[in-house]
Amino acid sequence: MLYSLTDKLKFNDSPQIQIKDKVLTVNNSARTVLELMDTVLTGGDLEGAKATMNLLFSEKDRKTIEKMNLSIEDYMTLAGVAMDLALGNDPDADNRGE
């Protein structure tokens, strides 16, 4: 028996985040998400946060983020939303019912 999975996969369907007029692409490849999980589980410090952003965004997008000069609160919000999207979660799911 041959089971075709091709039509059920989302090849190159990377989520994107828009901030003002900038669009950032989140790396949601399996390899990246597995590395991300390892980073989150073993870290939590500043180096872990930097490693997380390095995994989730391309160098070009990281430079764009840097130029935005975000506050730490906004930076952490961006990181959280990007992690949710990479994991296939709805970033707004935590805010339902408020």
Q: Over which residues does each language-model region extend?
A:
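Short, surface-exposed, charged amphipathic helix/loop patches that serve as local interaction elements
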Residues: 3-4, 9-13, 20-98
